[in-house]
Amino acid sequence: MTNQDTTIRPTPEAMLKLAQAEEAQSGQGRLKVFLGYAAGVGKTYAMLEAARERKRDGRDLVVGYVESHGRSETDALLAGLELIPRRELAYAGVLLPEMDLDAILARKPQIVLVDELAHSNVPGCRHEKRWQDVEELLAAGIDVYTTVNIQHFESLNDLVAQITGITVRETVPDRLLDIAFEIKL
C-alpha cells in the first residue's frame, strides 16, 4: 500500500514568518500587558527589563510614561532609555504631569512603554483615560508595553468590591486583555 498524500506541510518557522508578515500589513500595533495582583509586585520592573532586552535587540523604543515611585532599582532600569518628556497640565491650581501622546505619535517608535493603564488623565488631555491613549497608539501602528493590576478590569470590579470592600474607580475594558498579543504575570 502506498501513500498518495503528497501534501507538503509548512514548517513552524514558515508559519511564524507568515503570521509576522500579516501582522505587519495590518498596521495595528501590538499590546503587551504586565499584569499584577497588587501595587508593588514588580510590574513596572518586569516591563523595563523586557524593554531593555528589546533595546538590545535593536528595537526603536521610548518611555512614554513610567512611574518609578522613587525606587532606585526602577530608576536604574530607566537609565539609557529614551524618555518622552511629560506634559504639564494645570488642574485645580496645580501642575500635573501627563503622558505626551502627541509627542509619542510624532516620534513614532516601534515600542512605547506606558505605565499604569487604568490611570485617569487630567482634564485637558485628549482622552479621559490612559487606556484610550494606548488604543490610539496601537491604531497608529506602535507596539505598547503597559502595566495594570487585575482589579482594574471591568468584569472583576464587582467581585473585587465584594472581597475587599473597596470599589475600584479606575477601570479598564476587558477587551484590552482580549487584544493583547502577550500577557505577563
Residue ranges and their predicted role:
Residues 146-185:
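Internal gly/pro-rich beta-alpha loop/helix module
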Residues 116-131, 155-158:
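Conserved ATPase-coupling elements of RecA-like P-loop NTPase cores
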Residues 28-106:
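Conserved P-loop
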Residues 1-34, 64:
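Extreme N-terminal, non-catalytic leader segments
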Residues 60, 108-111, 137-146:
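Loop/turn-to-beta-strand initiation segments
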